[in-house]
């Protein structure tokens, strides 16, 4: 299925992507029980419907992301900013990210076309992928995700975390 964004397009085999996630036993934070991973899992249901629909339309289960890390926080809003990596079975059609920047993953954010799902979630796609499960079907397209997630584990996260 062709997805057109502001200045680039991707072609995603949504059903193969969805099938992979449905059959995978991997979970986000597999083997990790830290409070930040617990918060992401617990906060998923409170994410904006538009964000959940975006991932679902691509066939991606964000709770099975290859990586999801809290990078910084906004104490006034009780929000954590997570960066993550998800994989899709697909390819770039035009507006290739790689034409715009040859820098490593997160450094590329400032130099590449991005798509804002909404004010709380931005993504970009690349064929320069990492952390792909061996069983993931080709062709692999990596989606880098930056997402605001509320602290939902009670109280303020500043009472729990030391940044």
Question: Which residues fall in each region the model found?
Answer:
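N-terminal interaction modules that seed assembly of large macromolecular complexes
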Residues: 16-59
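A general secondary-structure signal for short beta-strands and their flanking turns/coil
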Residues: 29, 81-85, 140-142
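Short secondary-structure junctions and interdomain/linker hinges
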Residues: 58-65, 95
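Short flanking/linker segments adjacent to small metal-binding domains or redox-active Cys/His motifs
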Residues: 73-126
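Glycine-rich, aromatic-bearing surface loops/beta-hairpins
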Residues: 117-163
């Amino acid at each position: 299925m062709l997805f057109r964004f502001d200045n680039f397009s991707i072609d995603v085999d949504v059903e193969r992507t969805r099938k992979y996630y449905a059959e995978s036993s991997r979970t986000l934070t597999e083997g990790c029980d830290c409070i930040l991973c617990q918060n992401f899992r617990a906060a998923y249901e409170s994410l904006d419907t538009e964000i959940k629909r975006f991932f679902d339309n691509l066939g991606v289960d964000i709770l099975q992301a290859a990586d999801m890390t809290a990078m910084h926080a906004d104490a006034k809003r009780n929000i954590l900013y997570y960066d993550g990596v998800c994989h899709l079975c697909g390819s770039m059609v035009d507006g290739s990210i790689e034409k715009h920047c040859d820098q490593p993953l997160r450094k590329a954010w400032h130099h590449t076309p991005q798509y804002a799902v909404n004010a709380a979630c931005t993504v970009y796609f690349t064929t320069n992928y990492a952390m792909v499960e061996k069983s993931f079907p080709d062709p692999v397209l990596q989606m880098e995700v930056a997402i605001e997630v509320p602290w939902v584990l009670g109280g303020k996260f500043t009472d729990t975390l030391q940044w």
